Amino acid sequence: MSAIYNFCAGPAMLPTAVMKKAQQELLDWNGQGVSVMEISHRSKEFIALTKQAEADLRELMHIPANYHVLFMHGGGRGQFSAVVNNFLGNNGRALYLVSGQWSSSALAEAQKLAGDAQIDSLNIVEKHNGLNAVVLPDLHKIDADYRYVHYCPNETVDGIEIFDELDSPWPIVADLSSTIMSREIDVSRYGLIYAGAQKNIGPSGLSIVIVRDDMLKLPSLVQSSIMDYRLAVEHDSMFNTPPTFAWYLAAEVFAWLKSIGGIASIAKINQQKAQMLYQCIDCNTFYRNGVVASNRSQMNVTFQLADETLDGEFLKQAQVAGLVALKGHRIVGGMRASLYNAMPLEGVIALVKFMNEFAAKYR
């Protein structure tokens, strides 16, 4: 069977080695005679898995001891509301930096829950010579008392990534759903990090929360118990039955990432993949990208064909060539190639080859 390369933005492809291991032990995990999906989440065997998963993630991301690591339900959208309910209380205020579709969605959820009086926002994307560019504000010049400032360093729909470190007088809450573990970051700069698992961690249904201990002392609102960070900490992420199979696969992904050299190693590969694809786009008038070079996403490369009437043919022929899920988000159209950690370099080489051949054929 010819290789199939899945460029889906999420749920995304998982490392082949992880999928094969899961396949091999699907019916008999860890010598238990049953699947990991079938054992109790409170069994000593599964507890050992969860402890190892947390230890591996802490090692990979260099998470300080004063941070809690939570494995929760709800994905990124679930965390949009959890952040508000856990930190704002009845009269707290927050600032949302808007750089694309996902930060806009987080803002909308915060406004719905807390109201405009408690939520401020700043649009941080401008047009530079017709291209989208991020301009980070000097937050120290803002005279306000915020419980936190929220931002999304990588916008999957818009193909925008913020590489500069955000400097803030208030705790930083970051949606790292699409960029977690793709490059090294300093966790100690953040009050809270959250990430839906379905891009760089595992299957959908699980979200990772990394929260600094002092954040848990902020006033909270009455909310669903399963989204209460304090309860999650108190019960080791097991206040209720967690998504055990997703947790298991996340643990396997962490182990895989460690085996190939960790985040520093995969970051070099990710940079190489993105540079290769952007070079193909830039060297060919048949394709175009709408983001300044300094803010082009390494995880989600968006591009358009010069002749949009060829979009359907491009996708059809790409599918035949084993290059799937390249259609851009319905909001922006065009194409999108998601290059998460599990995407091998060979997949990008195959995509670039196809794009060059398609351009030569239809130019």
Curated annotation (Swiss-Prot):
A GO cellular component entry from the record: cytoplasm
EC number: 2.6.1.52
Residues binding L-glutamate, per UniProt: R42
Gene3D superfamilies named among the record's database cross-references: Aspartate Aminotransferase, domain 1, Type I PLP-dependent aspartate aminotransferase-like (Major domain)
Top-level taxon in the UniProt lineage: Bacteria
Binding-site list for pyridoxal 5'-phosphate: G76, R77, W102, T156, D175, Q198, N240, T241
Main location: cytoplasm
Substrates-to-products reaction catalysed: O-phospho-L-serine + 2-oxoglutarate = 3-phosphooxypyruvate + L-glutamate; 4-(phosphooxy)-L-threonine + 2-oxoglutarate = (R)-3-hydroxy-2-oxo-4-phosphooxybutanoate + L-glutamate
Pathway: Amino-acid biosynthesis; L-serine biosynthesis; L-serine from 3-phospho-D-glycerate: step 2/3; Cofactor biosynthesis; pyridoxine 5'-phosphate biosynthesis; pyridoxine 5'-phosphate from D-erythrose 4-phosphate: step 3/5
Location in the cell: Cytoplasm
Keywords: Amino-acid biosynthesis, Aminotransferase, Cytoplasm, Pyridoxal phosphate, Pyridoxine biosynthesis, Serine biosynthesis, Transferase
Cofactor: pyridoxal 5'-phosphate
Function statement: Catalyzes the reversible conversion of 3-phosphohydroxypyruvate to phosphoserine and of 3-hydroxy-2-oxo-4-phosphonooxybutanoate to phosphohydroxythreonine.
Family note: Belongs to the class-V pyridoxal-phosphate-dependent aminotransferase family. SerC subfamily.
Subunit structure: Homodimer.
Protein name listed in UniProt: Phosphoserine aminotransferase
Organism encoding this protein: Shewanella putrefaciens (strain CN-32 / ATCC BAA-453)
Gene (UniProt): serC
